[in-house]
Amino acid sequence: MTDTSLQLNIWKFYLFKVFEGFVLYYSIDKILMESRELSVTDMVQVEIVFAVFLLIFEIPSGAISDRWSRKYVLAINVVFFMLNTFLWAIAQDISLFMIGAFAASISSALKSGTDTSFLYDTLLEFSKEETYEKTLGNAIFYESIAAIVAGIAGAMIADYYGLAAPFWLTLIFSFIAVLLALSLREPEIQRTTEEVTYWEHIVSTGRFLWRHPFIYHLIFLTVILGATLNLADEYGQLYFVRVGIPIFVFGYLAAVGNGIEAISAKFSHKLRCYSRGKIYTFLIFVSGGGFVLTGALKSPFGAVFIFLPLLAYYVSCPLISSDLHREFSSGQRATGESFISLLKMTVYIPVALGFGLIADRVSVFSAYITVGAFVGLYLIIFVLVSFRKIGHIETIES
């Protein structure tokens, strides 16, 4: 691959992330569900359907990406996302929302680890893997800018034309993302997985993770921050409604969240020279504190703090991803990330169920405080158990 073709592939990847991330309904999807008479527990049940099937598909899909083609897997992932969008647009009860969640689980499983593995291997082919954090940060930055525009526009469209309109319009941008994925050039990486069977490849990746215990600490860090992030990201809309924030403002609030993601991803690589242990400890504290303050304040001012878990996760994401990818071989990247996503969903299912039950039986505010306490408990475990192990990794890196 020449310099020109490398740059072209990277920019096509950026464009793919932009159109894939241009989802007009993310700022109002829970409001659509509530308008169609779903309770918070119903919404969590839809999420559980997504999570359970993601657990089933996660590892096999990662192996498909490692053994077949990453660009085709990226394209198919968007096709299933389009099916999810269509089903939710026409859903009138929980059953179609659940079927849509099933399609979304396939989409998410196919995407998991495939996009970052494609990017890392593209850079590795040209010996530029040291720029991975920065390049991944750029991709997230551009995707987040698109999401900001989509969030604001989607809320306005929903306010003027109805809650279903943003779903229909999103399909156009998703179709363009499919075409962009198909135009990508597959990096020429030696695929050692051709020498083993499909299931042997999965087992060998699992054994690799099992034999490197210090990786556990990185994995559990991203699992806890990522699983709890979903509760702030997905159910923040319900908090906003309960503190009296009007729907048309939701797009601007989503823009704030996406702006945090964009800026965090863009500049987090500058933190690579600092102590990973101290950075991660601080970010866990920020995440837990954000949940507690959000639930305790019970006001529009409390909505400010719901963005702290997003800040913590998106600052950590490129750093943790880089640490993990340096440990995986090329043929194990997507499968390894799929194992991590599986663990994330394993944690998310009981946490989300507890969140939904507390939100329905007590209040959304109490549910957020409980999540904050859960993150606080992990902070204690991280400081006592993981801090030194993370320090060992950063010594190797520096």
What are the residue ranges of the model-derived segments?
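Conserved MFS/SLC helix-loop-helix module at the cytosolic interface between two early adjacent transmembrane helices
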Residues: 55-92
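C-terminal transmembrane bundle of multi-pass solute transporters/carriers
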Residues: 46, 59, 71, 239-398
